[in-house]
Regions:
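Helical catalytic core of nucleic-acid polymerases
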Residues: 94-222
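Conserved "right-hand" nucleotidyltransferase catalytic core of DNA-directed polymerases
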Residues: 1-145
């Protein structure tokens, strides 16, 4: 009974969407809801996401034998400190064949803080402990709304097999999302669509959004 009560918001979310779009979504996970919506938008625009291979329906994809880092690091990315300039130069000379665990151990200590680099982006964390604000210092928690989707749109990133039309549809979905109030089923569904198509499923080998070069362009620059 407790599990059911906790599940009510998710059940209602799927029921409301199902009624509006005329589909049964009760058993779909969040990512599938988002992916299916974006796939429908692409196919409405004449962009095929699937093809027949030996009589079986298969997702269209772009596979990469290797990815040159210099091809995905944006020209706008520049550093002033020698420590970061050295890493930037080194990364531009790398060619990767995998998308995970490639740059383990690559880091820079700057200003007493350690920055770790990887194919998932730039990360850093202070040592565990208690932090409190005072008269001289405040704790600032900053977030960027739709950060990865904004990178996709600003730099026109798209899975190679889906053409640049992907970018226009993607931007329209983002604008559409913000036309709905936060907390509405529509807003939630469009957020799922943006996250799946513009990032999460670009490295999913079972998805029609699969193109690891796009994944790396988003995470390394973002």
């Amino acid at each position: 009974a407790k599990f059911f009560r906790l599940s009510i918001p998710q059940i209602k979310f799927r029921e409301d969407l199902g009624i509006k779009h005329g589909k049964h979504m009760l058993w779909d996970n969040d990512k599938k809801i988002g992916s299916n919506y974006f796939i429908a938008r692409l196919q409405e625009a004449g962009i095929e996401c699937y093809e027949k291979v030996n009589g079986e329906r298969q997702p269209r994809q772009t596979h990469r034998s290797h990815i040159k880092m210099k091809d995905i690091i944006f020209p706008i990315v520049k550093f002033e400190s020698p420590e970061f300039q050295q890493v930037h130069q080194w990364l531009n000379g790398q060619v990767i064949t995998e998308t995970k665990g490639v740059f383990d151990g690559l880091n820079v200590v700057y200003g007493g803080f350690r920055f770790d680099f990887g194919t998932g982006g730039l990360h850093g964390c202070i040592s565990s402990g208690y932090v409190d604000s005072d008269d001289d210092c405040i704790i600032l928690d900053a977030d960027v709304g739709s950060y990865y989707p904004s990178i996709d749109i600003q730099y026109r990133l798209f899975p190679a097999h889906l053409s640049e039309k992907f970018c226009d549809i993607y931007e329209d979905v983002k604008n559409q999302r913000f036309s709905y109030a936060k907390g509405t089923p529509e807003n939630a569904m469009l957020k799922l669509a943006l996250n799946a198509a513009g990032f999460g499923d670009t490295n999913n080998e079972f998805s029609p959004f699969f193109d690891p070069k796009m994944t790396m362009a988003v995470t390394v620059n973002g």
